[in-house]
Every structure is written in C-alpha cells, then in structure tokens.
Amino acid sequence: MADVKISEIAQELGYTSKEIIEKANEMGLEDIKSPNKKVSSEIAEAIYQYVQSGEILDVVKKIAKPKKESTAKKTTKKDEVKKEEKKTTTKKESKNPAKAVSEKKDEVKKEEKQPENPIKNEILEEKKEEIKLDEKLGSNLNLAKRRGLVIVKKKKEESNETQINNEEKISTQATQGLSLSMIFSNSDESLKRKKKEKKNHPVASKKENTTKMDLLGDKDFADISLEDDDMVVLPDFSIKENKPAQPTNKKQPNILKQSLNNSINPFGEGGIQRRSRKKPPKKVEKKESEAITSVSIPKEIRVYEFAEKLGKNTGEIISKLFMLGMMTTKNDFLDEDAIEILAAEFGVEINIIDEADEFDYVKDYDENQTEENLSQRAPVITIMGHVDHGKTSLLDYIRKSRIASGEAGGITQHVGAYMVEKNGRKITFIDTPGHEAFTAMRARGASITDIVIIVVAADDGVKPQTKEAINHAKAANVPIIIAINKMDKENANPDMVKTQLAEMEIMPVEWGGSHEFVPVSAKKGDGVEDLLEIVLLQADILELKANPKAHAKASIIESSVQKGRGPVATIIVQNGTLRVGNTVVAGEAYGKVRAMSDDQGKALKEIGPGECGVIIGLSEVADAGETLIAVDSDKQAREYANKRHEYNRQKELSKSTKVSIDELGAKIKEGNLKALPVILKADVQGSLEAIKASLEKLKNDEIKVNIIHSGVGGITQSDIELASASENSIVLGFNIRPTGEIKERAKDKGVEIKTYNVIYNLLDDVKALLGGMMSPIISEEQLGQAEIRQVINVPKLGQIAGCMVTEGTINRGAKIRLIRDGVVVFEGNVSSLKRFKDDVREVAKGYECGVGIEGCNDMRVGDYIESYKEVEEQVSL
C-alpha cells in the first residue's frame, strides 16, 4: 500500500494538521512532527480509528510499548505523591483539635479562678475596654502612650492608666507573637504578686494636663527599670509635632536685640535690615550641606546637569572624570558607564530614566490592546538568500510577473512587498536584497515576518549571505523553510546543500529534523505549488491572529519621494485595519492617509492585518523599519512627531566630544586625514542607508569618505550649491537622473555629478577616487654596483672616481649611494659619467668608467657605488 501524508489524513477527518500530530503523539507515535510526514496505510488506519473512537490498535501498541510503560510508572508515582499529601493533611487536621482542647482547658481554668478575686475581674474588664479604645483612637492614643514614657524619664506623676499602658508595652516587647489568651494569663500572674488592691480609674484622655502619679513611688513597679538608654531607643513622634513651636524661641533674642538697638541707635531699623540680608546665605549653606543619597536622572545628561542633580560643583565632576582618564567639558554628554562610576565615587544611588518613554507611541498602543475580536490574518513570508540564487525569479513565477528582468544588473537593491492568493487565502511576500551591502534590509525583513524562505542554489551551495540570512531568521525566532532552487541545471546537487545546512543545525525532515526542504525550479516552475502548500500548512500551525477592528499598527519596510505624490511608504499591517483618512504617526513623520494602493498600483480603501500596500500623505520620508500607528487626532500625531524630532535633534547637536587620554594622540593624528567630501542622493531610504554604510567602511589610516549630506529624492540646486561650497566634493546619485537645468548649474559651478544604477559600480568608482588621493608607495629598483679603484682630484670639478662595474649598469641621472665598509656614507645624484673621454648614458658590467657624484668629495679607494632609481606605485583600497 502507498504511504499517506499526515495533511491528507487531516483533510479526510476534517481536522487541522496540528491536531492530528497531537493525536498521533498521544498514541505514542512521537516521530510524527511535520504535516508532510508520510506513514503506512496501517498506521493511518490506526490514527483514523483513534480519532473516531479513541481505541489504539495492536499495530500502534507494538511500536509504542516501552513509552506506555514509562507513562504508567509516572502515573503510579503521581498517585503515591497524592497519597502522601493526603496523609500529611490528615495529620495536620489531627493536630489542630488537640490545640483547641488545650485552649478550652485554659479557659476553664480561668473561669474557675475568677470568683476568687473580683478586683482582678474588674481590672481585666478595664484592659479589654482599653484595647477597644486603642482600636478606635488609633495613632492618637499611641502618641499619649509615648508621652507617658517620656514623662517617666523626667520623674513626673502619671495616671494609673499610663502605668498599665507601659506594662502592656514591656510585656508585648517580651512576648511578641503570642495569642491574647497567653497575654491575659501573664497579666493574671502579675496580679497575684501585688499585695495592695487597686481602685478603678477613668480612661486617660489625649490631653497632657491629666491626673499624674509617681511611678517610682509604687513598690509594685520595682522590677521595671526605665534607663536613659532605653528611652533613647524608643522613638517619640510627639517631638516632631512640637517642632513648629521652636522658631518662636529662636526669634525672642532677636526681639531683645531690636529693642536694644532702638534704645542705643535711632537708626536701629537699618541695622535690623542688614542682619536680615545676612541670613539667606546661611540657609543656603544648610541646604547644600544636606547629603543627596539617591537621585533620578535621564539617560541623556550633560556634565553640568549631572552636577546640578548631585548638588556638586561642575569643576568637581570634570576633575573626577579627568582622574578616571576622561577629558570632558561641561556640555558633554555622559554615557551610562560614566554615570555609574561617578555614582559609586560620590556614594549616590542613581535611577536612570529614559526620556524616550514620554513619546513611545508603540508602547502606549501595545498597553491598550486586548485579546478581543481576534481573527485569522494573512501570513507574512520573507524570501532571503545569497545574491543571484534566484529569489526574485522564484517570486516572479509565483506572481506571474517579470520583476527580475527589469532590475539593474539583475540584482535586487531594495525591499519589495507583494500579495499572492493561493486556495482563496492571501499570502504576503517580502523580497530582500542578497548583496552584502544590504545587511540592514535583510535584518528588517526578518524582524517583521512570520515565516522565512531561504533560497539556496543547488549548483552553488551555501554562501556567506545564506549563512547571514539564517542567522537573522534564528535571531528573530522565525520558522525556516529551505527552497533548493535551480534544480533544472545539470550540475544540481541537492544532497550537497542538505549536508552543508545540516552543519548549521538546519536538518531536513527526511533526516529526522524539523525543517522542510523543497526542491524547486524558478525557471520551469517545478515544486512551486508544493512550496506554497507547505507555507500555508506552517501558517496554520502558527495560528496567526489579529484584531481587524483595532487601530492600525504597521511596519514601514521602504520609503521614498515620488514626483507629484510626495513622501511614499511601503507598509505591512500587523494589527488592526488602516483606512483612507486615518491619522498616522511614524517616527518624525505624521499626517493623514490621502491614498493607498497595492503592489500592482490598484487603488485601495483599506489594508487589513497581514496585508501590504503603499500609502501617501506623510509629512516627510519616514525611516525604513519605523513602526506606523493610527491615532485618534492630528494634534496627538503632531505632538508625538514633534517630541521625537526635538529629542533626535538635541541628540544630534549635542554629540559628545569627550576623549580619553589614550585616544588623544589618535584624534590629533586623525586631523591629518584626507577626506573625500560626498553628497549622496538615492531613490529609496533603504538603498540610501546601505550605500552610506558601505561608503563609511571605505577608509584607512590616510583617507576616508566624508558624507556631508544625504537624502531621498532627485538632485536639487541646493545640493549643487553645497557641493560648490565644499572643496573637491562630488555628487553621487543612485537610481536617479539630474534634469538639464541641474546639469547646466553643476557645469557652471564646476561640480561633478555621477549617477549609478548598480551598487557595485558606485563602490568601485569611489574606491578608485580614494586611491588617487592617497600618497603613492615609493619603492627602490636596484640598477647596478661599481667598485672604486682610483680617485682623481680635478680642479674646479672635485673628485672623480675611477670604477669597475661589478653588477648591472651605472646610469647617468640615476641616484647614487656611496658605501664604505657596509655603511652608507653619502647619497646623491650622478653628475658625470665618462668612458675614457666620452660622455656616456650608461656603463655595463665588466667595463671601467669615471663617475662624478654631486657634492661628494670624500671618496676613497675600496668604496662601492650603488646605482638605483625610485619607482612610484599607485595605492588602491
């Protein structure tokens, strides 16, 4: 019998593949993990029978016997644990009645003792009444109790009730955690010791002028010792209440001074005013002297702001940083590490607050969301892989379009989003570039996707960008499907691809792994239908849901400026529904959605969850990767955008200029760097980011690229003016063309404009420009060597060396090096070269000649002359 797929069994039974896999696992068939797993007809029959009736056939029992035994053991262990728990609960219950009986016995004893001392009964009733009053009066009565303790220290009389309260305090300190019955039993024992009977006294009022008694005079309190040390330990909160009365005592001597001044000096009022002027500085000193133990500061804080928060002098902070090896000014920003070090130095606890939370509209949106009205949404699929492995060609076949043929150089250079329908269900595809310069785009694609398809060429195998794409997908914790493309080629080797990916922990299902490997041919269309079926099955397992009735939340995957339309953004809606007329905010950009269209240019009225589209109406070009949120009003959107803009502007303007002492030398050296000023313009935001990142990497110890301005859109007159103001600057355009007027303007100003549509060509040209600006490498080429055998002194000419050429040739005009005993004595140029009486251009090996060296009059017999020339080599990055 033929094998049957799990997905086919699910279709017959009317269940999802995920539910059938769970049922199979319950039966003990734990090797079934994928909807595409094929099983024999007998096991398929057994699964069918188990789903319908819950019976497990003998065929399955034979396979799953050992696993069932292990489960049985687990259940028995659980039963034993439950029995033990029941035993412990019964023991606890049996212990509780014993306590209750003992408490009852204590109560019976108390009742028997009560008729013996009727006075004790009255005192106990008084104590009960006092406890009730304590509960009613609360903190006021507590204050009265504390006053009682202070009065005892001063040996003043107190009421009998305060004495009882003191007894209660001492007893509670000794017997904390005891029950009321234990406390009353202790009070009975203390009453037995007393010889004198006490009379009933009224309850003490809260006022201070109540009846007082001498506690020390009573012999019954001889055991109680109230020392000064004990009094210090007990807090007296009543002192805090009397604090406002203290300033009146301080002012009294000032009034006496005023009266004295008035009597002595008729101008006493002036003196009083002068004294009042001297007072404020003293108050300030007191405030400054107060130590700050904890403070909350923002993430972005300057040195002087930090000093103000800590109540320190700015110079003190700067000197402390200097001692730690950091040179700063008062306007420099402090990073988190520096803040922590300073906090430890000054002994202050610091709580760092992120100011960005004030305008974090995404956080506000997520907090207000509830799991209501959830429905299934379209899956978002990202196609990733190495350059030229056929990602766009595969998407072309799926969409029945020809995108790849229209792309410059046959490579994708921006992110695109497309919608496809399969079996009546929508699927959103994101196509990402494979070139190494577009790392940020691939990371952005992986972060907003549900499933990643990694395309690998069967004839080429795993490449660096393939590995990078897999790492991005793993970092985003997204399911991975491998599409082995170019299976129509003769040298296709899918097994090689599988082994290479297995080394990266991407194991195919056939080898016991969890990743689907689908062989496809984007050219002929083989295997594409299977790929789409697997994508939909994977989406069913993920159970992707969203609330279409909520405010829209979307991710901007690409943005640009289009003539006649303004800022345009390609988005994928993640939750809610975006409609025409909605007010939105995305980073520093905001506005009303004026129009929407799909990937083929058809107008749309709304975009649902998981769907993609292009929107028009933002105030400016939003950053790619930014989150777009629909808000209630234009005012709210403008407020969010303006706060973000101001925050980013302050951050940009106040970039820290601090440098460590070790880096100071490197900074001074950097001032001597040559720089190529560049104005960069591109068609979309993503391409602009990629080119900027690539250009910034083109640098060494001598030269670098300085991007003085960059932006999305065409080249404008202001760009030409800026380029003309900067020396040796050029304008680079990517996928854009300047108008005739701009070309004329650039020609008049002497500005060079270069435009490209392939990123390789742009980077190669910039490398060549940088190489031309770099200092050439000068190398020496050895020409020949001669031995001096005779030195002739010629009047007015100086010394002439009679030489024998031992190696190579000696040339006129070449550089000469005079060597004596292996040491260079002199370097210069050949002034004259003669053979006999004739001037010659060069003398070859084995011939004699006369050589004159410019400015050298110290030649000796036995010295050697070395002839060489300097060669310049152009440097390239």
Swiss-Prot record:
Region (G3): 431-434
Compositionally skewed regions (Basic and acidic residues) per UniProt: 66-115
Domain tr-type G: 376-543
Region feature G2, mapped onto this chain: 410-414
G1: annotated segments: 385-392
GO CC, alphabetical: cytosol
Composition-biased stretches (Basic residues): 192-201
A family per Pfam: GTP_EFTU
Chain residue ranges for the region called G5: 521-523
Ranges where the record places region G4: 485-488
Keyword terms: Cytoplasm, GTP-binding, Initiation factor, Nucleotide-binding, Protein biosynthesis
Family matches, as InterPro entries: EF-G-like_DII, EFTu-like_2, IF2_II, IF2_N, P-loop_NTPase, Small_GTP-bd, T_Tr_GTP-bd_dom, TF_IF2_bacterial-like
SUPFAM superfamilies associated with the record: Initiation factor IF2/eIF5b, domain 3, P-loop containing nucleoside triphosphate hydrolases, Translation proteins
Keyword Nucleotide-binding: yes
GO molecular function per UniProt: GTP binding; GTPase activity; translation initiation factor activity
Alphabetical list of Gene3D superfamilies matching this protein: 1.10.10.2480, P-loop containing nucleotide triphosphate hydrolases, Translation factors, Translation initiation factor IF- 2, domain 3
Record's subcellular location: Cytoplasm
Ranges of biased composition (kind: Polar residues): 245-265
Function recorded in the entry: One of the essential components for the initiation of protein synthesis. Protects formylmethionyl-tRNA from spontaneous hydrolysis and promotes its binding to the 30S ribosomal subunits. Also involved in the hydrolysis of GTP during the formation of the 70S ribosomal complex.
Family indicated by similarity: Belongs to the TRAFAC class translation factor GTPase superfamily. Classic translation factor GTPase family. IF-2 subfamily.
Name of the protein in its database record: Translation initiation factor IF-2
Source species: Campylobacter lari (strain RM2100 / D67 / ATCC BAA-1060)
